[in-house]
Amino acid sequence: MIPDFPFPVPIVSAIVERQRQGVTEVLVQVRWKPDRDSVYSGTFEIPAGGIELGESIYEALRREVFEETGLRVTGFRPEVRTATHSQNGDDVFAFVPFCCQQQLSGRTRVGFVFVCTVEAAEPLPAPSEVGQIMWLPTTELARLLAEAPERIFPLQFPVLQFYLSQSTDG
């Protein structure tokens, strides 16, 4: 059972995409956390996780993608755009994600979603979190969301819907 928290947990999520023979594919993984989340273990998700103290949003995204897939992020969409400011020891910056997400009940989260590309290598699932990793064409991802929404981790369902609504080939 996942406890409720008094404040939302800040997270990052990565929609990892690649072009293969003119088709856009999205990396999806099987969530595998039976000891920590027996309800949703076995559902499809995208790489995501918490932002560590002192870590920039982009550092967190790179770390989470690497931890869960073994792949290194090579680019972002939209391109990285930031504004920074430092004053009295406070370092801050503004950034533009692809979209944002919020979980309102259960383990409440507020997240920042980025579309990114990774190195051309085979993914290696993190055994403590990920059961399997696959690349799905956007058309197949759209069919999965329409025909079997219960197979998608709920936090990522609206994110993937939004992504597909913005896609030119999904």
Describe the function of each predicted region:
Residues 70-120:
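Active-site segment of metal-dependent pyrophosphate-handling enzymes
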Residues 36, 41-43, 99, 106-170:
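Nudix hydrolase/Nudix homology domain
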Residues 28, 78, 134-137:
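Structural signal for conserved beta-strand scaffold positions within catalytic alpha/beta enzyme cores
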Residues 30-31, 63-67, 134:
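Short, cationic motifs built from Arg/Lys/His that form the positively charged side of catalytic pockets
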Residues 5-7, 50, 54, 107, ...:
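Aromatic-acidic/polar surface patches that form glycan- and anion
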Residues 1-46, 73-74:
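N-terminal strand-loop-strand
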Residues 46-84:
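The catalytic Nudix box helix
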